[in-house]
Amino acid sequence: MKNVTDSFVSLGHWPSAGSFGFNTDILATNLINLSVVLGVLIFFGKGVLSDLLDNRKQRILNTIRNSEELRGGAIEQLEKARSRLRKVESEAEQFRVNGYSEIEREKLNLINSTYKTLEQLENYKNETIQFEQQRAINQVRQRVFQQALRGALGTLNSCLNNELHLRTISANIGMLGTMKEITD
């Protein structure tokens, strides 16, 4: 230990005992000066350092508190957003289900309407066919009747002579006269 103190003594110059001052030469200072300086720094710096640390601690605590409040607000907003998302998903699912059921309903209505229209068209077709058949039958009947009438007239004209014709007319007039007397 003596070697260590001798090395410090040889490195620096000792101030005289009558004066007080700070030796700024680090190598020339002794342990007492260093301890005095450290003691003064600790004594006076303790308050400043503790104020700085307290301020820093308060800022950190305030920052943490603000962060917690922001976190709570963010969690609350997240829950609201999730709730809205669930609601929107539920509504979307409902719209999808309703849309599909509406589509199915419209599809069935369209199919039923188409069947009814086809049935009406089939009825109109059948009525038209029956009408055309009846018209054709009537035309055929009319032609047959006209041909039969022509044939009968031809036969009558060829078979009847004037005398037979006059007798038939007289007989018919006589029958009409008898019918008139019966009705009177």
From Swiss-Prot:
It comes from Nicotiana tabacum. F(1)F(0) ATP synthase produces ATP from ADP in the presence of a proton or sodium gradient. F-type ATPases consist of two structural domains, F(1) containing the extramembraneous catalytic core and F(0) containing the membrane proton channel, linked together by a central stalk and a peripheral stalk. During catalysis, ATP synthesis in the catalytic domain of F(1) is coupled via a rotary mechanism of the central stalk subunits to proton translocation. Component of the F(0) channel, it forms part of the peripheral stalk, linking F(1) to F(0). It is a single-pass membrane protein. It comes from the Eukaryota. In plastids the F-type ATPase is also known as CF(1)CF(0). CDD domains: ATP-synt_Fo_b. The keyword Transport applies. The keyword Transmembrane applies. Keywords: ATP synthesis, ATP-binding, CF(0), Chloroplast, Hydrogen ion transport, Ion transport, Membrane, Nucleotide-binding, Plastid, Thylakoid, Transmembrane, Transmembrane helix, Transport. This is ATP synthase subunit b, chloroplastic. InterPro entries: ATP_synth_b/b'su_bac/chlpt.
